[in-house]
Each structure stands twice: as structure tokens, then as C-alpha cells.
Amino acid sequence: LARSSVESFLQFSSRRDLREKAFQAWIRRGENGGTTDNRTLIAEMVALRGERAKLLGFATFADYRLDDQMAKTPAAARELLDEVWGRARAKAAGERDALQALVAQEGGNFALAPHDWRYYTEKLRKAKYDLDEAEIKPYFQLEKMIEAAFETAGRLFGLSFKPVSMPLYHPDARAWEVLDAQGRHIALFIGDYFARSSKHSGAWMTSLRDQEKLSGDIRPIVLNVCNFSKPAAGEPALLSFDDARTLFHEFGHALHGMLSNVTYPLLSGTAVPSDFVELPSQLYEHWLEVPETLQRYARHFRSGEPMPKALLDRLLATRTFNQGFDTVEYTACALVDLDLHSLPDASGLDISDFERKDLERMAMPAEIVMRHRLPHFQHLFSGGGYAAGYYSYMWSEVLDADAFAAFEETGNAFDPAMAKRLRDYVYSAGNLRDPSEAYKSFRGRLPTVDALLKKRGLADVTSA
């Protein structure tokens, strides 16, 4: 089950029984008994993490994990999440009421359930903005979105991308040589965009070789992996707007690795605190939504015509639509993660019981399910890079919203002076300096939460 295919089914299937069946299969991964049930293993991992933290002199694993992060303490991370959580719940309640009204309007005699949310949200979006995913997708060809990501990097950082024919690990993977403005080799970039059975779900960036100067001028080899639906032979790959955003997000990570300019490999590229590492990726998403980018690259796959301005305007008007749901879905995961790894004693832990009680304590809306439930929460338990650190996406979003506002304040989304500071202090700097100092060097001050609340449509919402 891949998220992109399951969510598309939940959006468009009119069969409520099949939506429920698909949704239950999706959210119950890892807790169905047998050899694929992860709950006992996860409980053991959480307990061992707590033991390790105590051996190192910390009260909990969360205290240990955040000690060298930008947030520094679990309390600081929770303060941000709590500020967003109340507003998100209030906004989601209004969204739920609108969807329930639509159910009643169509003669439905049932209470909105989690497997209904995306279906009726798509209907409401179409009614409210005269917009549906099927109308948008023909304008988002994978090839054009790759071009858009590359051209944005060219305008901001002077990079160009030259296709390279070389042996790779799978026929779907492609490679490009990355050159700077003077034509010098910067990196090798590999894109592997289509879903297949040998991949786990999601999208990610990884480095096959990091940039460093300790043993010579070593240039990086960087890989982006996605799970977009592969088209039939001879047909173009078409993306949802969310898929296109994912492509830009992962390419932001790739640029963080490719533009690295440090001496020591341990400080190279994305080797930064996890609550800072999402800044380059989430910030890069903003350039997809610059009207100039969409006008140039959002073109119909058959006619080649650009997206009509009226459709483009309606698309951009939806940016805060359903943000209550999106924010609740994410923030619940971040809060549960922090709470789980803040347990002073995790021995004898029942993962399902803990998740249920923690969500009840938080007053989680019944119509929304965590984006990643604990039994299949790969960020936390497949390597553990985000254990007690899933809050970092929201923390980084405070940074990215504030950082893009710096470009907007110049009146030019590609302002050269601002782009140079961004490259010097963020994309190329690795972990050379404390993230707070790096951000202040770029922005001239520390970030505020105001731009984030505005971006998510929460600025004028009163906490529930």
C-alpha cells in the first residue's frame, strides 16, 4: 500500500464500504498479529531508548534527543506544538461541520468518519473553488516538475543539470551532472521517482557520497526517491499538486547535500540537527507556488498550453483549505512522539493503549487519524532518526515560512542577494555553526511564528 494510491482512492471512490476497507488496511499496518505485528518490538525499542538516556545522565529519551537540537528541550518543542494544536483543532472542527453538512445535503444518514473525510473534502473543494484533482493533474507532468525544480535552483543558485547516461541500480532511476554557474562539477544527482514493490512508502533523500575536503575535493552523489504512480507505457506521469510539492521538498533536501561546502564529512550537507534539517526542503516548496513557476511549467500534457489563469488562481486560493485537518493529522503525531519518548519508565508498555489514551487526553477529533500511527511510524522506528524529533517538521516550518517572507519582503521571490545569503548560511554551511546563529546570519533575526500561522490559515483562529 502506497500513500499516493491509497489517498487518491479515498478522495475519489464513491463506494463508502470500499473506502472504509482501504482505510482500515492502511491505518492498521503493523498491528494485525503474526510476524508483521510491530507493537512488541516498538515497546522494546522505546524502553531501551529510555535506558540509554538514563545511562547518559538524562531523565528521558526526549531530553537526551533534544539536548543538541535547535529546540534544546522537550518543553520548548511542546510549547510550539501546543500553540498550533488548539488553533488547528478549532479550524478542523469548522471543516468537519462543513463536511457533515455536505453529507446531509446528499442524503447521507451517517456521521462523518475518517474514511469519509478526503472524499467529501474533494467534493467541497470542487464546489467551493470549482476545482478537482482530475482537472489539476493534466497540468502537472512529472517531467515538467523536474524541470521546474531544476530551473528554480538555476535562478537561485546558478546551477544547471546535464543528463548523464550511466549504469544505475534500476531502469527507472535517472542521473544528472550538476554544474555551477562557471560550468564546474558540483554533484551527481539521481532521481528514482516511481513506486515499486521493493520500495517502502514515502519519499526521501539520501546521500551515496557526502561532500568533504578532508581527503581531497570530494563531491557528493545525492539520490531522491519517491513513490509516484508509474504511468502506462507511452503515457506521461501525471502528479497531484501534493505530489509536485513532495518533489520540490525532496529536491530541497538534495540541494542541501549537493551545495555543501565544508571540510569535515561529519558536518557535511544534511548532517544538521533534525529540527533544522527540514528548513531547506520545506522552504524549497514555496517556489513551486510562485505564480511565475506555475505559469511556466504547469502545462497541459496534451496541448502544451499553460494552466489558465483562472484555474491557477483557484488552485492557489486553496492553500489554506483543509489546513485544520492537515495540521491536526501532523501535530497529533508530533505530540504523541514527544509524549512517548518522555516516559520516565517505559517497561511493560502497551503501544496501542498508550496511543489511544494519549490521543484522548489531547482531545483528538474522532474524524481524524494520526498521519502515522505508532505501529507503522517509520520516522520513529525504522532507524529512529526522528525519534522524539517528529516535531521538527513544524519547528522547521516556522523557519521556512519566516525565511520565505524574507524573499517576499524584497518584492522578488528570486532576489539574488537574499539567495546568496541563503546559500552561504543554510544550503552550503552544513553543521558549521549553531542553527540559531546560522538562521540569524541569513535573516538578521530569529524567526517568529506569525508567518507559519498565516501560511496555514490559523492566524485569526481562536484555540479550541
Regions found by a protein language model. Give the residues of each.
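Acidic/His-rich structured neighborhood in mature extracellular/periplasmic domains
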Residues: 222, 241, 256
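Short small-residue beta-strand/loop micro-motif enriched in glycine and branched aliphatics
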Residues: 8-9, 73-74, 231-236, 265
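Short, histidine-centered active-site or binding-site loop motifs used for metal coordination
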Residues: 26, 227-230
